[in-house]
């Protein structure tokens, strides 16, 4: 059996020798040195690591320099035994290891007989002395004990330096949020299959909190085995069974009776939320075969605040009288419920509307010690989230219906001379998103007049799988890893949008004279696929006992996307004004993506470490959900076409219409040529990163680190709008073409930061962490990402849009704590009922404070991303928190409109030129623990989110055309109370 497995590993490694690295690290590594009492090295010492919870054993032998490396150690608590002739046996117990950790340890031996033994308790280092990477660990204690809304563990990621969590993605060190890598047990767990996100939908983010052992975040100068990613990796490690049965039952509940009133509502909105489930793990065969399973479900019935501009009663009556066909569209809107000026087109509507969210989720994992040197792990996860989200239009809610399946098989082989890890990952998703106005068949009116209501049906499904191999060897002072990966993505998609009409003025609407019409016929069902190939090598070189060098190189090849039936067409020529390309080669492949990594860790003293380095990190473009999905997939039938005012008149298109009615006009080249275009030169996005930090161990349990972190991201997406109508005449430069999007990889993002981290691990009843970051991020688009960014205001002057990125937060502070209240000790340790009453109390919390994000002032025209002029004076108004009017309308002026509804020139105000208000919040939790015997524990806890009920305004209306321009329309939530009961053993 062992011989077969060993030969299989070697064959697999040979097969994959040209593939990329394992993107994420599930295991820990120990770099050890064995010495005698004088400090001289001890050669040929036998080293054994035993997992205290499962009985798993790893063996190696120190070399002539007394050096050894233990690799691929699953997270857990270990006993390390060192034996050498002429010395007493050294036994180090209680060494806690986490995923991705690389620890340097010394094992000094005492002279004596092997029959004698010296036992010590391990002190896991609190500072990193082995590598330059930035680590943020969310361990079991923080996951279980800190307050998390709806048991959402992803909110704890922002407790790390340089991490900003937004819209289910993570911006690491200012880099594009879809440039990170999200994995569970090392295998891809991206929810949508289109971009890296922390979830496809719902509260359960890829895996239940109950199943999580720890979450490891690696960024900065990560080793070459981390990739492909341009910013970093979030890896969730799930729990496994042990030799003891352990499990839990929990109930999480929220009701409106204990919640504060939303600041924009007159009464508390009804709310019923229940989250429930449990776990069970243990041995099937002691020391050999283990299992762990989790079920979690939630049912949410709540009222969400919906707000926006809606047509006034007088305006809609006037339009319907002139154009009766608009009655169905205006009937989808409620009437304003706030005061508005006589003759106004729109008024403001705000109310509470019913929302619904359900999910059922389960996860099963088994771990099998095949032999003393071979470990096999298998995990499977599935969930069925559903979501109903209300919007301003009661007739147009959005629903999601999703099915997700994820699995991973992991195999570890270890020996004295080499070790290896093999992983197979699988991810299958099905998603249907429906805007209900689509079902009504109503043509939409969007844009300039201050109100919009449109709808789409999107069906999306796909699969991605990967196979990875990593081999580790120890050669003197060199610990070498090399590995490979093959990962294939496939995605099918079908989507269609209702016709969208834009009218520049009220007079145009009354005359049914559309300024612009966008028809999205939808993409015929298709299957896109691409793959990643490459390899890496990593050498951790112990130059001296005080200096470690991390030398790495990885190569990545990202294939050009293809369509299963060769139905993918791109155009060539200057900015896409040319013939179609080969469907199997929509842009030029790049074969030279080499990414060097260089890091160092220098222990100036045993308690002071200087770390730093430089590296290149490469990602794939977000093809699915990005530009590729919009590329025309039929030569005779576009998926989207945009008609100018003159073109609409030429073809006789007026409100309303249907996609089916317009299709004959453009099918077979009968109308303007449409379709999105991707530049032939479309290199992969990458970042250049550099760091320098100083870390100090304050006590055995406390540390402080201060770091400078910088990076420069290159080749993220920019989209230009090509063949727009002339700003004055309203004519297109190339009349035979429609307006279309042109994607090129020319975005640049720069980030500089000073990051400071304080950590105190749990000791004497107290755990604490604090992070302060000063940072500045600059980009050229208002959605700097790898998928669908916003176009620049001026297509031919993208550099004029240089400004703060949308996730530029200048000052950011977080602190978290867990404190076991010493009430029983202060009361003299009472017995019986007194101990039951006073013992087991704890308090925990998270304090967040940050300055406001950038906000972008816009003007609605046929030129997307248009901005108005700044005409002087303060853009902000005083007493905004009392009046709710934050921006000063008189400081801005609309740019006059020319031909075809286009502004006659770009507006003068810069992109993201203004700032929103800052944010601060304190979440608290108070818990009482009841202990029954040695193993059973019941925790009853109350979580208070926004415990002080501080109003943090958000939702600023930034469109100059809006009647509510500059007003706050929402908050980031009033106080909520969540009750949780959890029984564990």
What function would you assign to each model-found segment?
Residues 2-6, 11-139, 208-210:
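Periplasm-facing N-terminal accessory domains of Gram-negative outer-membrane beta-barrel systems
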Residues 166, 441-444, 563-595, 600-744, ...:
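Solvent-exposed loop/turn elements at secondary-structure boundaries
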């Amino acid at each position: 059996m062992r011989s077969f497995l060993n030969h299989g590993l070697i064959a697999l490694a040979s097969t994959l020798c040209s593939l990329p690295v394992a993107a994420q690290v599930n295991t820990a590594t120990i770099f050890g040195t064995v010495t005698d009492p004088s400090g001289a090295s001890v050669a040929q010492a036998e080293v054994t690591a035993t997992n205290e919870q499962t009985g798993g054993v790893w063996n190696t032998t120190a070399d002539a320099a007394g050096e050894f490396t233990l690799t691929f150690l699953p997270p857990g608590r270990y006993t390390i035994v060192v034996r050498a002739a002429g010395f007493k046996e050294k036994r180090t117990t209680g060494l806690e290891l986490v995923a991705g950790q690389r620890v340097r340890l010394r094992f000094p031996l005492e002279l004596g007989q092997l029959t004698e033994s010296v036992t010590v308790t391990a002190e896991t280092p609190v500072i990193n002395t082995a590598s330059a990477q930035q680590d943020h660990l969310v361990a079991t204690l923080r996951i279980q004990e800190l307050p998390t809304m709806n048991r959402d563990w992803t909110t704890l990621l922002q407790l790390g330096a340089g991490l900003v969590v937004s819209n289910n993605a993570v911006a690491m060190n200012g880099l594009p949020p879809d440039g990170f890598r999200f994995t569970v047990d090392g295998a891809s767990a991206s929810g949508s299959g289109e971009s890296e996100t922390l979830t496809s939908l719902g509260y359960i983010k890829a895996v239940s909190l109950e199943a999580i052992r720890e979450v490891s975040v690696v960024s900065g100068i990560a080793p070459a085995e981390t990739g492909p990613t341009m910013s970093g990796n979030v890896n969730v490690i799930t729990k496994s069974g042990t030799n003891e049965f352990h499990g839990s039952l929990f109930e999480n509940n929220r009701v409106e009776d204990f919640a504060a009133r939303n600041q924009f509502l007159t009464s508390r909105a009804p709310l019923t939320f229940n989250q429930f489930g449990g776990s069970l793990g243990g041995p099937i065969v002691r020391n050999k075969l283990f299992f762990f399973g989790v079920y979690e479900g939630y049912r949410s019935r709540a009222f969400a605040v919906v707000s926006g501009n809606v047509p006034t009663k007088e305006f809609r009556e006037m339009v319907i009288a002139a154009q009766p066909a608009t009655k169905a569209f205006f009937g989808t809107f409620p009437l304003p419920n706030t005061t508005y000026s006589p003759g106004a087109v729109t008024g403001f509507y705000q109310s509470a509307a019913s929302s619904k969210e359900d999910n059922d989720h389960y996860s099963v994992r088994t771990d099998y010690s095949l032999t003393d040197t071979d470990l096999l792990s298998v995990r499977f996860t599935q969930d069925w989230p559903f979501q109903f989200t209300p919007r301003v239009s009661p007739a147009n809610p959005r629903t999601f219906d999703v099915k997700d399946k994820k699995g991973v098989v992991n195999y570890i082989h270890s020996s004295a001379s080499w070790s290896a890890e093999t992983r197979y990952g699988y991810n299958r998703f099905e998603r249907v998103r429906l805007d209900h106005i689509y079902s009504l068949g109503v043509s939409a009116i969007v844009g300039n007049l201050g109100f919009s209501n449109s709808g789409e049906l999107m069906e999306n499904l796909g699969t991605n799988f990967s196979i990875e191999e990593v081999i580790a060897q120890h050669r003197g002072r060199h610990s070498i890893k090399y590995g490979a990966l093959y990962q294939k993505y496939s995605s099918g998609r079908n989507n269609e949008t209702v016709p969208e009409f834009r009218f520049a003025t009220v007079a145009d609407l009354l005359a049914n004279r559309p300024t612009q019409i966008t028809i999205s016929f939808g993409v015929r069902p298709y299957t896109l696929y691409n793959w990643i190939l490459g390899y890496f090598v990593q050498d951790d070189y112990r130059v001296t006992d005080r200096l470690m060098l991390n030398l790495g190189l990885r190569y990545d090849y990202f294939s050009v996307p293809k369509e299963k039936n060769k139905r993918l067409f791109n155009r060539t020529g200057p900015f896409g004004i040319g013939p179609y390309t080969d469907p199997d080669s929509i842009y030029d492949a790049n074969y030279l993506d080499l990414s060097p990594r260089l890091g160092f860790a220098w222990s100036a003293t045993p308690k002071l470490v200087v770390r730093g380095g430089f590296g290149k990190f490469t990602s794939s473009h977000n093809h699915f959900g990005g530009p590729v999905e919009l590329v025309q997939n039929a030569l005779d039938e576009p998926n989207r076409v945009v008609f100018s005012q003159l073109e609409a008149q030429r073809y006789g298109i007026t409100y309303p219409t249907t996609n089916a009615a317009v299709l004959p006009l453009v099918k077979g080249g009968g109308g303007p040529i449409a379709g999105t275009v991707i530049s032939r030169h479309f290199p992969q996005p990458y970042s250049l990163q550099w760091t320098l930090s100083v870390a100090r161990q304050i006590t055995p349990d406390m540390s402080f680190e201060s770091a400078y972190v910088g990076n420069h991201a290159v080749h993220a997406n920019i989209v230009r709008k090509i063949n727009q109508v002339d700003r004055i005449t309203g004519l297109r430069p190339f009349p035979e073409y429609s307006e279309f999007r042109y994607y090129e990889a020319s975005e640049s993002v720069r980030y500089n930061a000073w990051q400071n981290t304080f950590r105190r691990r749990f000791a004497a009843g107290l755990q604490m962490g604090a992070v302060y970051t000063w940072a500045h991020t600059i980009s050229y688009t208002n959605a700097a990402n790898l998928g669908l960014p916003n176009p620049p205001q001026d297509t031919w002057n993208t550099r004029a849009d240089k400004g703060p990125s949308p996730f530029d937060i200048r000052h950011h502070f977080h602190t978290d704590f867990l404190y076991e209240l010493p009430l029983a000790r202060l009361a003299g340790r009472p017995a019986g009922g007194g101990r039951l009453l006073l013992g087991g109390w704890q308090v925990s919390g998270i304090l967040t404070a940050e300055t406001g994000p950038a906000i972008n002032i816009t003007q609605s025209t046929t030129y997307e991303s248009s901005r108005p002029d700044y005409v002087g004076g303060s853009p902000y108004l005083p007493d905004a928190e009392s009046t709710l009017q934050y921006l000063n309308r008189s400081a801005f002026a609309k740019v006059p409109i020319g031909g075809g509804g286009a502004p006659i020139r770009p507006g003068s105000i810069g992109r993201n030129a203004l700032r929103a208000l800052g944010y601060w919040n304190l979440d608290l939790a108070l818990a009482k623990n009841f202990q029954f015997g040695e193993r059973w524990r019941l925790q009853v806890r109350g979580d208070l989110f926004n415990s002080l009920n501080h109003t943090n305004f958000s939702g600023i209306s930034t469109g100059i055309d809006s009647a509510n321009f500059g007003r706050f329309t929402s908050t980031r939530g009033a106080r909520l109370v969540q009750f949780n009961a959890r029984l564990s053993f």
